[in-house]
Amino acid sequence: MSSMANEFLSGIDRDWSAERSVVLRYRNCLRFESSAGDDEELKNLFLRTSISEGLRIAPLLVYRDVEILVLDETSLMRTHTLKSIDGAVSIARSLQRGYQRIAFESGGNTGTALTVYGSRLGLETFLVVPSENLSLLDSTDFADPNAHLIAVRDREHVKKVASELREREGLPKVPQPEWRLEASNFIGSFLLEAMLEGLQIDCLVQTISAAFAPIGIFRVLRQQRSELHRLPRFLGVQQAPNCPMYQALKGDEAAGEVSTGDQLLTRVMYDSTPQTYGTVDELRRILEETEGDLVLVDSRDFDRLLGGDFGGAGILDVLAAAGVDIFVREGEIVETTGLLALTGA
């Protein structure tokens, strides 16, 4: 094993399991600041902000002779989505900068995580969210009197309202794009440890919006490319009703081949301009170096997955048997991004 791989493995804090907190397990495997003192300060703040940011890999099923494993990013997370990692990272970054009041826009997942993690440490939070997404939220996450929730009827105006709020109140914009990538580095570290220990991943499938997750993951994996010999092929999935990254990389004509409508398949991915974060070129690089691809799914594809027969069981039952908690509130699937990834696969 190479010296770089050994250095990574020796940096793992084995007092913390990955199922408990990938933030604390891998914090010393990553470098966040050029200054050693600033880097140590941030890592010490992670000890304060971390609650529960657990990941695990579970066998799901064999479909057409392909073994499908699920990266469970929900069951062991404080807020039931991978955005719990963003909560731990962004609130640590906010504390590092001395922020006491923060404002952010979100489809729900990131905003819930920032609210929960921020309120716990005394920050005043302002979440701007599309009003159609209110049913996805748990009111108990916003019980703190300093946790403010602002609903906007037209989802296309959410960013504008949040920007005006920050300007009027003198509030910082969080999370910054680099913080999102840092959060994804922890997912990459989890996958890297598994791969260095022998897990073979031929293809990594994820639902994407701005593609912060795959970019952060592949930044970590790329550093150990010589040890891994090859990177997993990346397959990015977008919902047909809102597919700006697909359009940016493949063109509007290609996107037009799929039937679209106004109803989003995953309402938390409401942003129609995620390419403005400047992530298109790095996503293109990942697709080129891994011989990957982007695909679209629509409501018909999604319905086929939900109604499909997998060895006599539905997909939600298969996931439950694997120990994966798909959060459902009042009969509605709250977290659909993982199911969209399965649909695209």
Give the residues covered by each predicted segment:
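PLP-dependent amino-acid enzyme catalytic core
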Residues: 1-345
